[in-house]
Amino acid sequence: MAMSRKLKIRDLTLRDGQQSLFATRLTQEQINRVLPYYKDAGFFAMEVWGGAVPDSVMRYLNESPWTRLKTISEAIGGASYLTALSRGRNLFGYAPYPDTVLDGFYREAVANGLGIMRIFDALNDLNNVKSSVEKINAVGAISDGAVCYTVDPHYTITFMDRVKALFGKKLPKPIFTDEYFVEKALGFEKLGAKMVTLKDMAGLVNPSRIASLMPKLKQSLKVPVDFHTHCTPGYGLASSLMAVIHGVD
């Protein structure tokens, strides 16, 4: 059966790929060698900045993160949107920053070629991403709200636990349900995010779970939905294919 829609692919090799495999140590010279191939590939987007990149570029490589972004932008020449990953209120650092810092930082990032800012909070606290979504929209880039995926701890409920429940003991209940993730995604949409990503940074979502969750996200959201995962347990590719089958953009 022919596909009636075009799948948009975002490549993460130059940010999350090198961050996950060798601690974000790609030099500018190494990156420059592959940029012509990226321009020819014509991905919808490339995640090339943010996360640990700015810190590592300065701390370990003695290079400028702004030069990194601008050089990639000039080489790609609009063939793909350039993406960065922001920790919301924490930006690319490890402490919360005031709105004045967020405003200036995002403005400079867009001026140096950034097209999409993927924004997340590790606890899915929308209060920590609200300003970032608003400020990215205000400077003309695409705000991408990333909902962090995780799973509930495994609890073994014994017979005695059930007996104690009759006398008031509370049994553990699931927290990270499909409805939880849909609610967080809708929260991003309400804040003004132009797209939403289900971000599975630990590679925990299996194919059967994505087959359940992705249709609910697509049915609930008006904005495009992206899916990001890792292959830590070995089924990242299968989960990605299942996301495609169930309508991921």
Predicted regions and their residues:
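N-terminal amphipathic alpha-helix/helix-capping segment at the start of soluble metabolic enzymes
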Residues: 1-22, 69, 73-74
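Short, well-ordered coil/turn segments that N-cap beta-strands
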Residues: 4-7, 42-44, 77-82, 113-116, ...
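Conserved, mostly hydrophobic/aromatic
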Residues: 9, 17, 38, 119, ...
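Active-site beta->alpha loop and helix N-cap motifs at the rims of alpha/beta catalytic domains
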Residues: 45, 50-183, 203-206
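Catalytic cores of alpha/beta
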Residues: 161-165, 179, 183, 233-248
